[in-house]
Regions:
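Short Gly/Pro-enriched turn/cap motifs at secondary-structure boundaries
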Residues: 17, 100-101, 161, 165
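Short helix-loop capping/hinge motifs at secondary-structure junctions, enriched
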Residues: 2-4, 117-119, 149
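CN hydrolase (nitrilase-like) catalytic-core segments centered on the catalytic cysteine
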Residues: 44-140
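A short, polar/charged loop-to-alpha-helix boundary motif
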Residues: 7-21, 134-152
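Pocket-edge structural micro-motifs
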Residues: 39, 113, 143
Length: 186
């Protein structure tokens, strides 16, 4: 059945011609904990959303995407790996593969997560976008250890009086300052 709906928050060109922006993140509960969901551009260009999900307790992040080769070689895998490392979260990413009328898509569906080698991302299934095997039309599964998704920066740090390394109050002030600029008001 339906567990909810997510509307993509950020729309790259040409999507505003046929879609409207969403305004809310989407987290759903599972027996293994909360899971966050985002779509394509939300993930690759707006890291705040993944960080929000990790801070809310998500150890798994789902990225539905249609990343084409015209977006360059660095955007996809580099962003996913960095998000996995900096937020200490698993990412399940499903990308289109092959060609449509206008685009050639990388493929690169994968399950990426924290490694036992700290500050490294590991591909538990699938391949980076630019790997020649990424174009495979295939469904991937993997057994993952959610204990590796420590999200330590979102937990109390005894070395700084129990506060967290992540400091949303500071970012709130920074964003409130940005909102004074009319170009950022909706």
């Amino acid at each position: 059945g339906v567990i909810g709906a997510y509307r993509k928050i950020h729309l790259p060109y040409p999507e505003p011609h046929w879609a409207t922006r969403g305004t809310k993140p989407f987290i759903f509960d599972t027996p293994w904990g909360p899971v966050g969901l985002a779509i394509c551009y939300d993930t690759y260009c707006f890291q705040e959303l993944m960080r929000y999900y990790a801070a809310k307790g998500c150890r798994l992040y789902i990225n539905c995407t249609a990343l084409a080769k015209c977006h360059g070689i660095a955007l996809g895998s580099t962003t996913l790996e960095a998000g996995c490392i900096t937020n200490q979260i698993y990412i399940v990413s499903a990308n289109l593969a092959g060609t449509d009328k206008y685009n050639v898509f990388w493929g690169g569906s994968s399950i990426i997560g924290p490694s036992t080698n700290f500050w490294e991302a590991e591909y538990y299934a699938g391949y980076p976008f630019t790997d020649p095997r990424a174009i495979q039309d295939k469904m991937y599964t993997a057994t993952i250890d959610l204990a590796l998704a420590t999200r330590e920066k979102f937990e109390p740090n005894p070395l700084i009086d129990g506060g967290t390394d992540f400091r949303p109050a500071i970012y709130k002030e920074l964003y409130e300052d940005l909102l004074k600029d009319p170009k950022f008001q909706e």
